[in-house]
Amino acid sequence: IGTYARDKDAISATAALCEAAAYYKEKGMTLWDAMVAMYEKYGYFKETQYTITMKGIDGARQIAEIMEKLRKNPPKAFGDLKVEKFRDYQNDVIIDMETGEKTTTGLPKSNVLYFELPDNAWCCARPSGTEPKIKFYMGVKGTSLEDAQAKVEKLTEDVKAVL
């Protein structure tokens, strides 16, 4: 693609997409065929987000309280998915929830909490920096698109239940 448009992400992405389409066309495949082949090889991943909006000064306080509650008392599980590791980027710590072992993240401090779950599933919480919101991002791996969709929907409901 070259380096002539470093700050033009959309242009670079379009060029990369066209290059991929040409590559797979030579192999008798569409981009969809290639994506399905990657799913079959690596798994079906699905991500979503859940946002809670709380307006005003009380809302900002409530958002801070939710983050502090999750930080000080991380959930042991979301539904039947046990939290394996808990990352607190603000305090630069990763806690193995089974052994209690602590290591550092080695990354810049940020008000972000990340929960590692079994089978490549995860949940991440962070307050918005520009709006009165707290956002929860979730990801799962399934054996099919339908399985991944069902898993991410269940994880979303399990996260809501913890809150």
Where are these regions (language model features)?
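Active-site beta-strand/loop architecture of penicillin-binding DD-peptidases
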Residues: G139
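Phosphate-binding and adjacent anionic-ligand microenvironments
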Residues: I1-R126, K133-K135, S144-Q149, T156-L163
